């Protein structure tokens, strides 16, 4: 864990405070001396597991540093909450119906305009880590991406069109590859825009092998709705809606004063 934290600190010290939205990226590119841009994405990462928002579960000092030195959003939304379509929205600045990528089975149309293409004349652009758009990246001078969802252990990457299997844990590898590009492979005459996209903590939520027992003796309180069973709820809702029609019929036939209207549930489940 400490090994990864040290590397994360090193990445954060390359020259970025925070890059959190496309308008900010556009303003960076339009400056007389453009700023470096590092866009870090973690997958299916709930805000409750970032200690800048909630300290109940885990400490995340480097993410907290970004929040403290930059901006923390307390009321934010995504254009699409599905993994790959959300990535397409990020690249294009367009809603899913406009960019053509509506679910995880789609193929991203790389011929359309994206923000890396818009800044590529000024920036050395790269994406490293999870891509998940079922096509080769466009608008990047360098790309080194996981295949599909990617594997947590000994994952296979595609580096500028060439498959490479790397030994180790996906998060560590992605970080190492990013550091190597930043320090030794990019065009240092230009500012950089690096999209560093991690697979973790997407299900199956597998950690580095050294962290497998990190929370072995920890107890986390379950939410009140954890054991809720939603089976049959839709049918119950529709039944409730039909009852309103039955009641309307009773009143329309002027039977309300003459009859008793009774509803019961034999199993008391709803």
Predicted regions and their residues:
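Formylglycine-dependent sulfatase
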Residues: 2, 7-16, 20, 26-270
């Amino acid at each position: 864990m400490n090994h990864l934290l040290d590397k994360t600190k090193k990445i954060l010290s390359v020259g970025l405070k925070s890059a959190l939205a496309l308008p900010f990226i556009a303003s960076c590119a339009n400056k007389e001396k453009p700023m470096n841009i590092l866009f870090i994405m973690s997958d299916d990462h709930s805000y409750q597991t970032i200690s800048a928002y909630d300290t109940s579960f885990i400490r995340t000092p480097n993410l907290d540093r970004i929040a403290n030195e930059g901006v923390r959003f307390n009321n934010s939304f995504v254009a699409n909450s599905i993994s790959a379509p959300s990535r397409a929205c990020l690249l294009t600045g367009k809603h899913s119906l406009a960019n053509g990528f509506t679910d995880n089975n789609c193929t991203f149309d790389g011929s359309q305009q994206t923000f890396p293409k818009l800044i590529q004349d000024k920036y050395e652009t790269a994406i490293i880590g999870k891509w998940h758009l079922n096509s080769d990246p466009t608008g990047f001078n360098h790309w080194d991406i996981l295949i599909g969802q990617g594997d947590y252990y000994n994952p296979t990457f595609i580096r500028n069109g060439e498959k490479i299997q790397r030994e180790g844990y996906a998060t560590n590898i992605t970080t190492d590859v990013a550091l190597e590009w930043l320090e030794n492979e990019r065009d240092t005459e230009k500012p950089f825009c690096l999209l560093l996209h991690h697979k973790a903590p997407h299900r199956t939520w597998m950690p580095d092998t050294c962290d497998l027992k990190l929370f072995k003796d920890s107890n986390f309180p379950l939410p009140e709705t954890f054991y809720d069973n939603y089976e049959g709820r839709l049918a119950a809702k529709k039944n409730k809606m039909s009852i309103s029609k039955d009641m309307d019929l009773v009143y329309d036939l002027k039977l309300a004063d003459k009859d008793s209207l009774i509803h019961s549930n034999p199993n008391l489940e709803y």
